[in-house]
Amino acid sequence: MQATTGQSTSHQRPNRNKQSATWCLMLGAIVSAGISPAAPQSAGAAEPVEKMADAAESVPRPPVDDNDLRRWLENMIWHHRFTVDEITAATGLAPAEIVAAQARFDVRPDNRPARAADSPLLLLPYPGGRHPRLGFRDGAVRPRRETKFSVFTPWDPTSYVVVDLPEAIWSQHGLIWLAHEHVPTVWTKQGIELPVLEWQRDGEQGLSLARKLPNGVAFTAHAVAAADAIRMELKFENGSTESFSDLRVQICAMLGHAAGFAEQTNDNKVFRDPYVACRSTDGQRWIITAWEGCQRAWANAPCPCLHSDPKFADSAPGSSQQLRGWLSFYEGNDLDAELARIEATNWRAAPAR
């Protein structure tokens, strides 16, 4: 996401995975039973499916096997409510293959398992194929899905926030990580393509991603769902032989697919460093995020999104450090009391595990 300080972000396009010719055999006979996912029900997503897929410019990631295919179909159909065209954009599979797989695994919009009322917030990897932003998409071309996860609202199972953890990391050398393409990074300037990764399950309710950069620096992201919040961590490890400074991080919470929060304005936002909150159109609900070490609390109206962007301390060779973050939902009209309640949880000291 482009910062208003004049610095902008980019990402090197990863290698395109080739769709295996064996998928037709693996998926079995094509079924013409008329099974297809429901149309997208995300807030503000009034664009035609074809336009949405075009704008996303996603690099498809074919499933690695049947288990992977089934997990992604459940993710995309049961929860994100993707259309067949959007699943094609995410996976590279042909529409007929997708329909056949839906029939084989019996994954339909109307047979999603019910969740218990006391379940943790639903936290899922974001599948790609549908752009997570409503606007300013030219500032996030070919978004990489491996740093993005969806958190579904407790009041509407079809609405979700997409968190990019991290969207970007700067150092004194420039941009060392970017989760999409926009402007050159230190790696694209050298012609280096970073490998494609995926979120890994971290316990029953968590996700984890570890990436090592070509210079020996590594970062690890964690997100864990509880009933009241998503607790997050970002760890920075300096495995290089030089010190790093000016380690600024962008962590983006995109609201365009959360009903009632998709207005492209900052008039519905509240900034109380480190807390950034967005009010729903009816004024009765809030989405709240915060990070320790916040050096800039802001929002980008066209996206729309929330930022509580932190900064790591300077990093000597061999050192490591971590920052903790928070995302939650609130129903009520006393934001001050809710922020005080969140502060009292001592979330900065609680590990995301």
Describe the residue ranges of each PLM region.
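Short, amphipathic alpha-helical "recognition" segments used to contact nucleic acids or chromatin
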Residues: 66-81
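Beta-strand-rich recognition/accessory modules
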Residues: 182-194, 198-201, 281-353
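Bacterial N-terminal signal peptides
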Residues: 21-36
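Extended, loop-rich substrate-binding clefts of extracytoplasmic carbohydrate-active enzymes
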Residues: 173-226, 243, 247
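Acidic (Asp/Glu-rich), glycine- and aromatic
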Residues: 224-265
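Short Lys/Arg-enriched helix C-cap and helix-to-coil transition segments
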Residues: 109-126
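Acidic-aromatic substrate-binding/catalytic surfaces of carbohydrate-active enzymes
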Residues: 123-196, 204
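A contiguous, surface-exposed recognition patch within enzymatic or periplasmic domains that forms
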Residues: 144-168, 239, 253-319, 340
